Amino acid sequence: MTPQVLTILGSTGSIGESTLDVVSRHPEKFRVFALAGHKQVEKLAVQCRTFSPEYAVVANAEHAARLDALLKRDGAATQVLHGAQALVDVASADEVSGVMCAIVGAAGLPSALAAAQKGKTIYLANKETLVVSGALFMETARANGAAVLPIDSEHNAIFQVLPRDYTGRLNEHGIRSIILTASGGPFLTDDLGTFDSITPAQAVKHPNWSMGRKISVDSATMMNKGLELIEAHWLFNCPPDKLEVVIHPQSVIHSMVRYRDGSVLAQLGNPDMRTPIAYCLGLPERIDSGVGDLDFDALSALTFQKPDFDRFPCLKLAYEAMNAGGAAPCVLNAANEAAVAAFLDGQIKFTDIAKTVAHCLAQDFSDDLGNIENLLAQDAVTRRQAQEFIAALG
């Protein structure tokens, strides 16, 4: 069997580390061509020593020099690259068959689009790619024969319970709606009066999942679920009015599909990202992920509730942006990234995140986003507007 040749973008993040864990269990199936780790030089050096990629990519020349010195000390042959163009190069290299797109935020868009243009199998963990450029990205993938496989646990669950011959038309398959589950985050039952005093340290402690800091805050505001709604809209060609969100605090049911005959098909499992990663990497077979069996005896109850927009205004803003279409999702994402970064840096309150996003969505913006240059220009404009609003908050 010829091994699949992988580029893993975001290898030092939680998704990247989980991917490498799965890859390490199947050395006969996978070969790592390139790893990209932004600024975590020491962790990336360990990964390079373990997986011997041809290339490693970091953010800038300073980090590249540090990584190169570490690798040369150990006699590693990995070539070190840096910068945004290097990400594009390793994502689109002829040797590569599959690209794990796990860079956080809109920064992951150019490399994901480059992989689509070269017809790669794209393991999509970067939801912002579809939020910011859904129409452009999916059309590019279709035009070049690129397969887009969802890594997000919710979208992967949907992917698993949709018909194998799903055409992107719900009615043809008797589907009434697609249901995304959400944990509700760490503040689901907290008094709303305490939200102004929520600290970054509290917000990054997700009750069920092991995730990075930014996505953990997004989970706490439920903006993460809002971004996933927009992602599902593009991945599954699903009209906004056929997408539902239900809060399920135990994170055992990862998502569901509601059918016309009254059936609801769900995918269950322990909350561990290695399951969706292994599912996509192993297609069409099921491969070992290292995840333990779901223990039904240990499950006391599975509960569900509707999301409360007063508690989660970011989810409401995401619904509005999805329904508005055009540039609104791009603006939503850019404003949120700026606001979350400011919150994590101690500049604004937890409740100011939604205020910042709402302010940016109220500004005038163009819907002419037919190319990556216009998308990135709008992204930059919105970030500037968000930063100005944040500065005015004092």
Language model features: what each stretch is:
Residues 1-394:
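Catalytic, metal-anchored helix/loop core of enzyme active sites in primary metabolism
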